[in-house]
Design a protein with these regions (language model features):
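Sec-dependent N-terminal signal peptides
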Residues: 6-8
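N-terminal signal peptide c-region/cleavage motif recognized by signal peptidases
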Residues: 13-17
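Acidic, glycine-rich flexible loop segments
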Residues: 87-108
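Central antiparallel beta-sheet cores of small beta-barrel/beta-sandwich binding domains
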Residues: 20-92, 111-140
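Positively charged n-region of N-terminal signal peptides that target proteins for export
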Residues: 1-4
Length: 140
């Protein structure tokens, strides 16, 4: 009986130990003094959970992101879907701003930050020339 229970518990626990996937993307504004940040997103396929953080260059702390929603659109049959993903930036338990990213396949077409208090929008471009990894983040 004890062996059967242990086997059953092990079978239940194995799917729950699935790996969380991590993606690191680097962004910056245009201009002489660009604003740069690293976006880390996390996804757990078993729990169907998604979240993330942003860390601005020169900052030691990451700002948590709360997944708001994702829209998908098929632009052409047989091509990757276009996704528009929105996250809320959370500071002291309140929504401080909103990040919206439009992507298709591996291409990121736009990234916009909107300040919740002022409504000011800031457009960012993907920094493809910056090396990034899940272990070290963006190497500015």
């Amino acid at each position: 009986m004890k062996k059967s229970l242990a086997t059953l518990l092990l079978c239940i626990a194995l799917p729950a130990s699935a790996e969380v996937s991590t993606e690191v993307l680097c962004f910056r504004t245009d201009g002489d003094k660009p604003v740069r940040f690293e976006l880390r997103t996390y996804y757990d396929d078993v729990a169907k959970w998604s979240g993330g953080v942003v860390r601005y260059a020169q900052s030691k702390t990451a700002i948590p992101l709360l997944f708001k929603h994702e829209e998908q659109e098929e632009l052409a049959e047989g091509r990757p879907y276009q996704f528009t993903t929105t996250w809320w930036e959370m500071v002291d338990g309140k929504i401080n701003g909103e990040y919206e990213m439009m992507s298709q396949g591996a291409m990121v077409y736009s990234m916009t930050y909107t300040n919740a208090r002022t409504g000011k929008k800031t457009a960012f471009g993907r920094a493809l020339d910056v090396d990034a990894s899940a272990k070290s983040g963006c190497r500015w």
